[in-house]
Amino acid sequence: MKRRIWAMAAAAVLGVSLLSGCGEGGPDAPPAAEVEEDGASGGNYDLSQVEERIYVLGHSGSAGSTNDFWGLTFAELVEEKSGGKMTVEVYNASQLGSDTSIAADVQANSVDFQITSPAAIPNVVKESAVFDMPFLFDTVEEAREAVMDDAVFDGLTDAFEAQGLKLFPLTDQGFRCITTNKEITGADSFRGMSLRTMNNPYQIAWFTAMGVAATPLNTSEIYLALQQGMLDGQENPWSQVYDKGLYDVQKYVTNSNHVLYVGCMFMGTGNWNELSSVERQIIWDAAQECVPIVQEYTDSYENEMLQKLINEYGMIYVDFDQIPGLREQLREETFDVAYESITGAIGNELLDQLLTVAGYGDMIPQ
């Protein structure tokens, strides 16, 4: 079916009409210890156990971004399922603070929900570094299958809970991709390149292994640094390249697909534990239903942004798939450094599980 919130978000960005639907996806419902599964059957909830309450959700995405669409979709689903008794107010564009500060407020139970990327909060739940392993996937479908693996999600759930956070089913904003002012023709093109990265120690480590002069900068600082010639390139989802106007200061856009930009939503365990079993089930079900809806929106939105970058703003598309062996070479150059830096921080169990699911079990050090 077509959801009202989808049309609202699309109109806010591009006026693009996107189809969405609810389907199976993500981990199973929470264990009975947290949610009484008979408290909700086929979407029929005992609303006598639901209190009227306003919840607060914060994120750093701009209006119309994937995270904003995700938050608004979640809010609509919660309202529908609760018969209007549970209202989620969504605050976008860092109105509640930075990703790190919002996460701290969620841990303190002063903000109810946050939507962000684990890569943006590496010091909050260190195990989320598992998704910083580069060049594992050729397609977004492969990446999503690995990320949604039950054992991977269970390990992350335990890690988030240890930090006072209840993790909900994961989704994503597509791949992060590199843009540059010089054409990429092979792995040697990266030697000596000054490239903006996230302020993420694991990604900085493996970008450095590629020969890149990794330069961590906040998103708001990228345009000026490129304009002044301080950087040769940067990496972000295509939508961020468009949203920040980087087409003015970058010539080439690629499908490097070096990491999936995983998205996560979580709640403080203090607030979670105060909810009734029905309220918890409503929230979990809404979060799980968001997964396929957000993925479909992401795919449409990111592809639309790429076409705009190429056709309207004249960026030149460099297809990594047409450069023989490029991703494989970059994977080999970065694997050991990435593996050692990540497992040095979080141990090897969770990363080994992801690598096995992704088809790289034979590359795991023995």
Put a short name on every predicted segment.
Residues 141-157:
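A gly/proline- and charged-residue-enriched helix-loop-helix capping module
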Residues 23-141, 160-366:
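N-terminal secretory/targeting leader peptides
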Residues 1-9:
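Bacterial N-terminal signal peptides that target proteins for export
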Residues 17-21:
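C-terminal motif of bacterial Sec signal peptides marking the signal peptidase cleavage site
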